Design a protein with these regions (language model features):
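Conserved catalytic-core motifs of GNAT/GCN5-like acyltransferases
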Residues: 118-122, 132, 137-155
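Conserved hydrophobic/aromatic "anchor" residues
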Residues: 69, 92, 114, 130-131, ...
């Protein structure tokens, strides 16, 4: 089941990220970079700021257990939904949870008459294949300097709704 979160529930996103990231990114980036990015992107102040700027957060939940999450933003002027975050607990991958969260964003895009979804994903992330299988295409390579000598080496991918 997918539930949208309120501002007071954003700690759930931080808690999930701290569980998911160290395992999911261990072969892509260093543990130091993982720690840096978690502190930068998933602290409560940053999550609240993003929420106030229009980012929506939703979790995938079974019984009382949170198994994954998505963050997205509707960009009406560009007729686009930007998926900022989509993560599933490593023990729950390949069970359709990621597809369910992605379908959730696609459905929101259709309801809001958006033309496409886009997202950024690390170029070495196995999720690239998941997105391609789902109908996303690679638009460009992006190398973003995020400070402290770290870079995000991503693909920007898009999906036409």
């Amino acid at each position: 089941m997918i539930e949208e979160l309120s501002a007071s529930e954003l700690h759930i996103i931080e808690d999930l990220a701290k569980i998911i990231w160290p395992v999911s990114f261990r072969t892509m980036i260093s543990q130091k970079q993982i720690k840096y990015m978690l502190e930068w992107m998933y602290n409560q102040n940053k999550l609240r700021e993003n929420y106030q700027n229009g980012h929506k957060y939703a979790v995938y939940k079974e019984k009382d257990t949170f198994l994954g999450f998505i963050s997205y933003e509707i960009k009406k002027k560009k007729s686009n939904i930007r998926i900022h975050k989509l993560y599933v607990h490593h023990e729950q991958q390949k069970k359709g949870i990621g597809q369910t969260l992605l379908k959730y964003a696609i459905d929101i895009g259709r309801q809001n008459k958006m033309a496409q979804l886009d997202l950024f994903v690390n170029r070495t992330n196995p999720a690239v294949h998941f997105y391609k299988k789902t109908g996303f295409s690679i638009v460009e390579e992006v190398d973003l300097d995020i400070g402290n000598g770290y870079f995000m080496n991503d693909y920007r991918m898009k999906f036409k709704i």
